[in-house]
From Swiss-Prot:
Biological function: One of the primary rRNA binding proteins, it binds directly to 16S rRNA where it helps nucleate assembly of the platform of the 30S subunit by binding and bridging several RNA helices of the 16S rRNA. Forms an intersubunit bridge (bridge B4) with the 23S rRNA of the 50S subunit in the ribosome.
Entry-linked PANTHER family: RIBOSOMAL PROTEIN S15, BACTERIAL AND ORGANELLAR, SMALL RIBOSOMAL SUBUNIT PROTEIN US15M
Transmembrane annotation, as ranges: none
Organism annotation: Orientia tsutsugamushi (strain Boryong)
Gene3D superfamilies assigned: 6.10.250.3130, S15/NS1, RNA-binding (1.10.287.10)
Family label: Belongs to the universal ribosomal protein uS15 family.
Protein name: Small ribosomal subunit protein uS15
Length: 89
């Protein structure tokens, strides 16, 4: 199941530093994390759906690239985002 418009707006308002800053790394990572969670649940039920598994790997890869960019640019924002999203460490 994909993310609803209301859920996406809630994520944007929660993680954006400005009112409608949808392009910030924090917002993009939050939306990707939500999509990854939904797709993980789908892949657990439909374990032979290899196209969705590939899509899941692509989403994880793009989130990893965004997080590594943020880690290089601003370590404090990176650690705050990791803690808020509940990712590693």
């Amino acid at each position: 199941m994909s993310i609803t418009v209301e859920r996406k707006k809630a994520l944007i308002s929660e993680y954006a530093d400005l009112e409608n800053n949808t392009g910030s790394v924090e917002v993009q990572c939050a939306i990707l994390t939500e999509r990854i969670i939904n797709l993980t649940q789908h892949c657990k039920i439909n374990f032979k759906d290899f196209h969705s598994k590939r899509g899941l790997l692509m989403l994880v890869s793009s989130r990893r690239k965004l997080l590594s960019y943020l880690k290089k640019k601003d370590l404090n924002r990176y650690t705050q985002l990791i803690n808020r999203l509940g990712l590693r460490k």
